Amino acid sequence: MPRETGRKVIASNRKARHDYFIDDVYEAGVSLMGTEVKALRMGRASLVDGFAHIDRGEMWLEGVHIPEYVQGTWTNHTPRRKRKLLLHREEIDRWAGKVRESGLTIVPLALYFLDGRVKVEIGLARGKKNYDKRHALRERQDRREADRAMSERKDR
């Protein structure tokens, strides 16, 4: 069987980009069990309720749902268990300082295979207020209307 190359996205967290301002983005490895990897190869995962936290110098990913592997036996995993993120100590310490001092949170943005290994894209996030969300929605609608008007003008 040939070795996988490239990036294959399994799941993305579009809700996080709607609910938060993303300040910094980083790629981390994920420590998984065998049945979790098999379930991910089937393309099944949900990042919607996911978040990461730092505990005793280690970063953990929680709230991410990876359903049980259908052909799994008694060795199957728990769908919402804590999963350890694989980062260097300096990176964890730097993010811990930012989270502690300014009240930011760490959210998963995407889960993907990179050259056969499971990676998660995590972001340092600051919560949006309702008026920020409405403003972003209004900007998106205005941009869409302008593009539509330009394409109509081009068609004439």
From Swiss-Prot:
InterPro entries assigned: SmpB, SsrA-bd_prot, SsrA-bd_prot_CS
Any single biological process term in GO: trans-translation
HAMAP family: SmpB
Organism placement in taxonomy: Bacteria, Bacillati, Actinomycetota, Actinomycetes, Kineosporiales
Subcellular location: Cytoplasm
MF-aspect GO terms: RNA binding
GO CC term, one of those recorded: cytosol
NCBIfam families referenced in this protein's UniProt entry, alphabetically: PRK05422.1, smpB
Superkingdom classification of source: Bacteria
Family recorded in the similarity comment: Belongs to the SmpB family.
RNA-binding listed as a keyword: yes
Classification via PANTHER family: SSRA-BINDING PROTEIN (PTHR30308:SF2), TMRNA-BINDING COMPONENT OF TRANS-TRANSLATION TAGGING COMPLEX (PTHR30308)
Functional description taken from the UniProt entry: Required for rescue of stalled ribosomes mediated by trans-translation. Binds to transfer-messenger RNA (tmRNA), required for stable association of tmRNA with ribosomes. tmRNA and SmpB together mimic tRNA shape, replacing the anticodon stem-loop with SmpB. tmRNA is encoded by the ssrA gene; the 2 termini fold to resemble tRNA(Ala) and it encodes a 'tag peptide', a short internal open reading frame. During trans-translation Ala-aminoacylated tmRNA acts like a tRNA, entering the A-site of stalled ribosomes, displacing the stalled mRNA.
Protein name as annotated: SsrA-binding protein
Chief location: cytoplasm
Annotated gene: smpB
Protein species of origin: Kineococcus radiotolerans (strain ATCC BAA-149 / DSM 14245 / SRS30216)
Pfam families according to UniProt: SmpB (PF01668)
Keywords, comma-separated and alphabetical: Cytoplasm, RNA-binding
